[in-house]
């Protein structure tokens, strides 16, 4: 397993509400946890150096939760059907940098139409319209990181 993959896993763990993550690739495995356990050690020698700082920012995780709670009252202002991110990842409006965007504001969409891509761990996940309607707003900029359940679009 490549150290870059381990670093990406740590970043995803920090960005999400997950407390522990274990990945197995063939005979190799790595376990990353927000809470240190002396019995469970990652296979990689470098991994503990990266896993230890993850436990330290745990109190800081309360601050984004408080910020999310403060911004929660703004959520009811969204009109129509709100399409939310099903995962933590990176938001892309098009299949590639040279491709046209999947949708634009004011465009009509049908249930099942692809609205965007959320990339998570090098996997491109198509996000589809849950209802038919018109794109009222696009709430995220292309290439920006998104959180689980973050609003991406409104469809009216």
UniProtKB/Swiss-Prot annotation:
Keywords: Biotin, Fatty acid biosynthesis, Fatty acid metabolism, Lipid biosynthesis, Lipid metabolism. The modification N6-biotinyllysine is found at residue 122. Pathway: Lipid metabolism; fatty acid biosynthesis. CDD domains: biotinyl_domain. Disulfide bonds: none annotated. GO terms for cellular component: acetyl-CoA carboxylase complex. GO terms for biological process: fatty acid biosynthetic process. One of its GO terms (molecular function) is acetyl-CoA carboxylase activity. Residues 80-156 form the Biotinyl-binding domain. Transmembrane segments: none annotated. SUPFAM superfamilies: Single hybrid motif (SSF51230). This protein is a component of the acetyl coenzyme A carboxylase complex; first, biotin carboxylase catalyzes the carboxylation of the carrier protein and then the transcarboxylase transfers the carboxyl group to form malonyl-CoA. Homodimer. This is Biotin carboxyl carrier protein of acetyl-CoA carboxylase. The gene is accB.
